[in-house]
Amino acid sequence: MLTLDTLNVMLAVSEEGLIEEMIIALLASPQLAVFFEKFPRLKAAITDDVPRWREALRSRLKDARVPPELTEEVMCYQQSQLLSTPQFIVQLPQILDLLHRLNSPWAEQARQLVDANSTITSALHTLFLQRWRLSLIVQATTLNQQLLEEEREQLLSEVQERMTLSGQLEPILADNNTAAGRLWDMSAGQLKRGDYQLIVKYGEFLNEQPELKRLAEQLGRSREAKSIPRNDAQMETFRTLVREPATVPEQVDGLQQSDDILRLLPPELATLGITELEYEFYRRLVEKQLLTYRLHGESWREKVIERPVVHKDYDEQPRGPFIVCVDTSGSMGGFNEQCAKAFCLALMRIALAENRRCYIMLFSTEIVRYELSGPQGIEQAIRFLSQQFRGGTDLASCFRAIMERLQSREWFDADAVVISDFIAQRLPDDVTSKVKELQRVHQHRFHAVAMSAHGKPGIMRIFDHIWRFDTGMRSRLLRRWRR
């Protein structure tokens, strides 16, 4: 069967122009205009999706099949082009019957054209084929437009669903244009409103805990660029204004330390005549420590000196992915659980904004893994937030899982974050030594987010940074009172 793409080539129908018109109409639709005004960051992300839409429409037109009636009419037209005028006159009755049987839009006009001329000439033969071709072009264009209209409705429905999802999550997860683009890419999954409302719920909880949010931001910025002075700095000329006593004596305004011999105090001048104090006088003269009269009159002059150019190189510290281990033991339930999940959501926001990866591992009796920054990040985040913390605490297994992942090439510069109350058994010696080796040799950083003031110091001593967020009732009341 004839494909629509082949028909367009045969009749020289420009499908690119039709596709561009459809995309322009889609972007100009009122729904998108209102959305772009409300969420300007997502406008660029949706616009970046246009090439994908264009390619999908091309593929759809290429694979579409032409109706059998139109296919048969096109075949008849191609055969008629090969006929000479006498042959065409012989075949004309069959051609007209075929057009009538196929209900072709050209059938009635073709019969009227033939009936209006008693003799079929070569010019009439050419005119007949030209008008027939125009009719086929109109039919092919109409078929393209119908197909593109169906695709436009389907695409608009898909975009509206993704806009609803992205619009709900943009205030929570999109901190800049990069994050907005990644959020839009994630919204392509099949999600229902009730699913992503869980993210909205924990986003609202995070806004109610600004201290927890700031803690996540500080952890995310813990690898700032460091400035390093250059050792090979060149000398440069530096001009400065120096204030000096006026050469013309004026009113005495007080005393000062200087090397002005002409205005020495008599006691200072007397030391010059004492042999034992002569060297002391010269030392103080060189160091400008002699007591002299300070005149009221002052003047400024320009002094030219040379000094090293103070330029600095910046050692950009790598900001790698996050590997976050969350304690799901029973002691981490309730408010601790809410804080841990909200903290991971804040790290996900940072990862999206800085184009980093965010990998979550839940540890208790077994380890469950989620990647919140992947193409299915929203679905993974919903699954993670749906988990309940009711297991035991196996901190050693958590560290072993972290170390195993850190040894792979794609995670070599990752930061490990452990969220727990750290009320657990001490770590085995082999785990402790391996962590120290990773810190010393590979410069991996281990962060602890302590949800309790009663964590064991012996466990927490292994971490590079300890971020404390006490979830006890007293600390919660104090934070609320300060706000």
Curated annotation (Swiss-Prot):
It is found in: Cytoplasm. SUPFAM superfamilies: vWA-like (SSF53300). It holds the Pfam family VWA_CoxE. One of its GO terms (cellular component) is cytosol. Its main location: cytoplasm. It comes from the Bacteria. Component of the RavA-ViaA chaperone complex, which may act on the membrane to optimize the function of some of the respiratory chains. ViaA stimulates the ATPase activity of RavA. HAMAP family: ViaA. Homodimer. Interacts with RavA. This is Regulatory protein ViaA. It comes from Escherichia coli O17:K52:H18 (strain UMN026 / ExPEC).
